[in-house]
Amino acid sequence: VHGAIKDAYAQACRVIDIELNAVTDNPLVFPRNVSPDDEFDPTVEETVISAGNFHGMPLALVMSYVKNCIPVLASIAERRIAKLTDPATNDGLPPFLIGNEDGTDSGLMIVQYSAAALVNDLATRAHPACVYSVPTSANAEDHVSMGANEARHVLDMCGDLAHVIALELYTAAQALDYRRDMLNAARALAKQGDWALIAARISNPPAAEHPSRAQFEREVSELMRALADSD
């Protein structure tokens, strides 16, 4: 899946490079005896060509392509969060990664809720804008790409994708802390040879300290900034 998305991203970059280096005027005016390289060429005749090079559909289509990739990446990240917080699939880690079985703390359950909500919102916004052309300029521009809307959607959606990935990193860090503590406890208890005690200790890890909302939001924001600063 990630490979397919990398290919889609590469295609978008290729089209963007072409458009950045393309002539978008209309009409295109070619002076006599001047080649595209601004060198004298006696075979070139002066001419004016009316063309649709101004149209933004090449960019609009690849932006729509990228929009479809974003919720796919986010969905995969959310599924990993769900697997880590579900005791049926997290390979012995405590439910919702909190180690509290008395029901007084929901742990990282709401983290998965947040990721699920973001994935749903991203999937909703992935619908292409370029298929809804609305004529402008007294119908002189009777087919409009809406490429600017597509690009704006991509920018906004990338921020939400980073949010989902930050939530996954936060969850993974909590899971790793538990796994490390459980392994350390197992190693320490193994020296005593009390296997019943070892089994009980591993299956009932101590409750983790639940961060305050402000602390949680600060840490997730720091993860998002780190993602934005990375290559």
Which ranges hold each PLM region?
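C-terminal auxiliary extensions adjacent to catalytic cores
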Residues: 1-231
